[in-house]
Design a protein with these regions (language model features):
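Proteins enriched for Cys/Gly/acidic motifs involved in redox and nucleic-acid/cofactor modification
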Residues: 1-154
Length: 154
């Protein structure tokens, strides 16, 4: 049994969310997995995500490769088509304990390979970010947006 390896690409929110996912994965007992938290802000960011996934597969041939983050949210079919990728998880799903519970060795074969919901259907505040509300600064999940449906959000 080995703890999951996490690779974070992109913004500070991704770094914060990677730490939250690390806790969720540990609590669920996920092992022998590599999680890539991607960025989609530019085409170059998506290209680097694919490059990182290929490198991680070479370095970890027996691990389950799980791709999440904004690039996985916006291009799930692209990442699902990569032979190196075992699972694609959307931005909403990556923060749900049930998603990580389904990634344990005894359940991994019984879960959907691609779990990406429409982010515009999200109607609740990201619970893992609420701790930051009492401070002067907080992280805002641009990829999930808000209920105002601005065109700024992905």
């Amino acid at each position: 049994m080995s703890a999951p390896v996490f690779s974070t690409l992109g913004c500070r929110l991704n770094a914060y969310e990677t730490e939250a996912m690390r806790e969720l994965a540990a609590a669920a007992g996920v092992d022998n997995a590599v999680v890539v938290n991607t960025c989609a802000v530019t085409a170059e960011a998506v290209r680097k995500a694919k490059q990182e996934i290929r490198r991680l597969r070479r370095d970890n041939p027996q691990a389950t490769i799980i791709v999440t983050g904004c690039a996985a949210q916006t291009e799930p079919a692209t990442f699902a088509a990569m032979p190196e990728v075992d699972r694609v998880i959307g931005n909403t799903e990556k923060m749900q304990p049930a998603t990580w519970a389904a990634m344990t060795p005894d359940l991994i074969g019984q879960t959907e390979r691609v779990q990406v919901d429409d982010i515009l259907s999200v109607r609740e505040t990201a619970g893992h970010l609420i701790d930051g509300f009492g401070r002067h600064r907080a992280y805002v999940q641009v990829q999930n947006g808000c209920d105002h449906r601005c065109t700024f959000c992905i």
